[in-house]
Amino acid sequence: MTNRILIFANKTWEADPLVGVFRNDQARPPKFPDFDTPPQSTIPLNDGSTKTVQARLVLKSTSATAELWCIKDLMDPARSASSSEEKARVLPYVTAIGPSPSLVIAFGTATIANANSYNGSVVVGSSVFVHNPYSAAPNPNSRWTHGDIGKFLDSSQQPINSAIFPSLDRDRASVEARMLPTPLNPAKPPILIPSASYVALSNVNVTNFNDYVWADPEAMDACKAAAPKQSVGSVETTHGVVRLVVPSQQFIFVSGIANRLGYINMEVAPRSYAQNFAASHNAAIALAWSIPALMA
């Protein structure tokens, strides 16, 4: 049976650079899988209607298919684009149109908890910790809950790690040579930061960006308390939603670093499109150079 890989990009500004890199023979590795016909999924909306959404692209090898979906494409436009609850509602409709995936990849921009700038760098890891900063007082715009919130989910020993992480180490020079600098406080230069032990820390149900000021440090403290020996690779909102909602034997996250923790208003907001584009593009380069090993 052909393995099914599901790639979920969070927002359109993350999916668009990923598609561009996958289709550009100057950006991707020379031995890249062929493209196939994208599937469609019908998504019920909250007003009782439906919409049909097509995968952004599909890759096919002799042993695997890889579908790229944009979560924002799937969501009800009447709901907040940052709603973890809405993201969790729509993801199962993609899972349901095919066999259970053997690998799920969460892709998007993120922050990093480091005083030094790694803006434009790319973190690749496999483990997850999800924190809900509104557990005591639910956010009316996103009330998502799950039994694994607050638990450390360790994927550091999964079999696929022996393929992707050595591959990234071998191809580091090719990946980093294609990276773009971010316009604001760029890493000099941006680098590839892969480790199977890295944790994606997902802070869920945040729909007001001003809340990141207190919610992200709270999430860091919660992760440290639950998994004191683990290293947080990136902090964002959605990798963990994908991990908890889409059942899979294996999981990888790819985070393009757009800003330092606590600096979104200084390092993203003034040049939001360009900052996020560069971070997403660089993450796309890293994922593209991983694809041959993942689909072998």
Where are these regions (language model features)?
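Accessory terminal and edge-of-domain segments that mediate assembly/interaction
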Residues: 1-296
